Amino acid sequence: MKTAKIYQYQLPMDSGVILREQRLQQRDGLVIELSDGIHTARGEVAPLPEFSQETLEQAREDLISLTQSWLNNEELDLDSNCPSVAFGFSMALLELEKQLPQEGNYQAAPLCSGDPDDLVVKLNEMSGKKIAKIKVGLYEPIRDGMVVNMFLELISDLSLRLDANRGWTAKKAEQFANYVHPQFRSRIEFLEEPCATPEESLAFSKATDIAIAWDETVRDDGFTVKTQEGVTAIVIKPTLVGSVEKCISLIEQAHQLGMQAVISSSIESSLALTQLARLAAWKTPETIPGLDTIDLFKMQLDTSWPNCDLPVAQLADLEAIWEN
């Protein structure tokens, strides 16, 4: 017999986590637990403030309605629900049907969100290919350019992924590029969405020979993966995109065109983060995913991230907010 439970969690965050204009002091989310009478599986529904189109309250309503439909054996159209619900529920179904391989790719590209010295330490500990991610667009573009140039000059086998979150005008993007030496630009694996519009970002890439990737653009209505000069990758954040099936379709479209598809975190808890690592190992085995976000938390949830010493909150200790 089918049964389901929905839990709500609150996890404390590191004090330095800032999303656009908002400091994220705690991460709020939902966990859907599905059982078919034999097996039990879980998925996480955690809209990201400032980035998700839906609120947690809207996601909760959507999730309850979808869960009821599943219990009633109705046909499900997962992506007619808000993206975080479509992702979390589809992941729970995938787990329930034993279709998500256990092996994960936990070699996350380290994220520099503050002190550059911290990134140097992480990179020195890395074995194999050195790839790191730096958030740009939070400070003056000239400073960003100097920091990027410094890393590329300092570590000769380093490749960087940069993320501007559409934060620059065309002029500011140009200022950034002026401070990155042309000989180093090929080691920028890609710069996610440098400018406010895709058109400006494409023009920036053409003028600077700096490769770009689509992130926010992937979530625009009607987006399809296509060959465009300068675009070498798409970044897929499943919590913001939708069902696992939709994400896999985007991955396959990118691979068919010779582009990278990078599975990336939306600051989910360790429960969903480990599932994303498994999805990455399964569908993007040649690409290091963008999942270096566990250190932004003060606590894990249900499933521990490998080699992470943070305490783990158990779902069993949380009260179910809905069950049937």
UniProtKB/Swiss-Prot annotation:
GO terms for molecular function: magnesium ion binding; O-succinylbenzoate synthase activity. Its EC number is 4.2.1.113. Pathway: Quinol/quinone metabolism; 1,4-dihydroxy-2-naphthoate biosynthesis; 1,4-dihydroxy-2-naphthoate from chorismate: step 4/7; Quinol/quinone metabolism; menaquinone biosynthesis. GO terms for biological process: menaquinone biosynthetic process. It catalyses: (1R,6R)-6-hydroxy-2-succinyl-cyclohexa-2,4-diene-1-carboxylate = 2-succinylbenzoate + H2O. Transmembrane segments: none annotated. InterPro entries: Enolase-like_C_sf, Enolase-like_N, Enolase_C-like, Mandelate_racemase_C, OSB_synthase_MenC1, OSBS_N. Its cofactor is a divalent metal cation. The keyword Transport does not apply. Gene3D superfamilies: Enolase-like C-terminal domain (3.20.20.120), Enolase-like, N-terminal domain (3.30.390.10). Keywords: Lyase, Magnesium, Menaquinone biosynthesis, Metal-binding. Coiled coil: none annotated. Mg(2+) binds at D163, E192, D215. The active site is at K135 (proton donor), K237 (proton acceptor). SMART domains: MR_MLE. It is an enzyme of class 4 (lyase). HAMAP family: MenC_1 (MF_00470). Converts 2-succinyl-6-hydroxy-2,4-cyclohexadiene-1-carboxylate (SHCHC) to 2-succinylbenzoate (OSB). Belongs to the mandelate racemase/muconate lactonizing enzyme family. MenC type 1 subfamily. This is o-succinylbenzoate synthase. The gene is menC.
